[in-house]
Amino acid sequence: MFDIGVNLTSTQFASDREKVISRAREAGVTGMLITGTNALESQQAQKLAEAHQDYCWSTAGVHPHHASEWSADVANTLRRLAEKKDVVAIGECGLDFNRNLSAHQQQEYAFDAQLALAAELNMPVFLHCREAHERFAAVLEPWLPKLPAAVIHCFTGTREELTACLDMGLSVGITGWVCDERRGIALREMLPLIPAERLLLETDAPYLLPRDMRPRPTSRRNEPCFLPHILQQVANWRGENVEMLARQVDHNARKLFGLI
């Protein structure tokens, strides 16, 4: 099982980052993608991936929260990072109209620019969308024929939005959000709609600790080593064999990010 979304550059991991990676290995996590959310963190993510070759890879991008930071210098930084073999996707990029930490116009501009970069470099995109589906689709769709692959990370949208994403050819990342008995029930019921070859799993660590873990981790910090719990629950709710699903999501991740 491959974790496609780990915020390993987070300061929450500053004191034990190497142990976090070791625990993931021991738990059976077969690889992980370290998320870049701005120019600096994308550089840090690449360095971590380089230090753990053939187990960690990274993305290079600007999260919509940081879209106001977009500039020609940032674009050039991402371009240079994308030349490195450890960097396998452009992103995390997209739109977030929930928290609006950057203006909508800035978000759309940075999103479109990163899609253009991914198309130019023939790289997959690692996508973010929250409460912005209509504009997200409008910006994304013209680029899809020029992109080798795309995954919408941490999907939490509606059934209609899921159908639209699948119709666009996107793969879908599922996190521990689905384990939340308050917010995750609707998503749980949608799991069987995702074709097996389009399903990816992720922790989004250190965020989104699965609420149904027992005993509950005392730190309340999510880690990649908790991915087996998400896998087990998703397999249960999809009515699938756990081992087969583990192999499937690992294959899906490696295929999407060009690792096989």
From Swiss-Prot:
Binding site for a divalent metal cation: E92, H128, H153
Enzyme category, top tier: hydrolase
UniProt keyword annotation of Cytoplasm present: yes
The protein's required cofactors: Mg(2+)
CDD domains, per database record: TatD_DNAse
Pfam families in UniProt: TatD_DNase
GO CC terms, sorted: cytoplasm
Keyword annotations from UniProtKB, A to Z: Cytoplasm, Exonuclease, Hydrolase, Magnesium, Metal-binding, Nuclease
PROSITE patterns noted in UniProt: TATD_2
EC number of the protein: 3.1.11.-, 3.1.13.-
Localization: Cytoplasm
SUPFAM superfamilies named among the record's database cross-references: Metallo-dependent hydrolases
GO terms for MF: 3'-5'-RNA exonuclease activity; magnesium ion binding; single-stranded DNA 3'-5' DNA exonuclease activity
InterPro entries: DNase_TatD-rel_CS, Exonuc_TatD, Metal_Hydrolase, TatD-like, TatD-type_Hydrolase
Organism superkingdom: Bacteria
Subunit structure: Monomer.
Recorded family membership: Belongs to the metallo-dependent hydrolases superfamily. TatD-type hydrolase family. TatD subfamily.
Known function: 3'-5' exonuclease that prefers single-stranded DNA and RNA. May play a role in the H(2)O(2)-induced DNA damage repair.
Protein name from the UniProt record: 3'-5' ssDNA/RNA exonuclease TatD
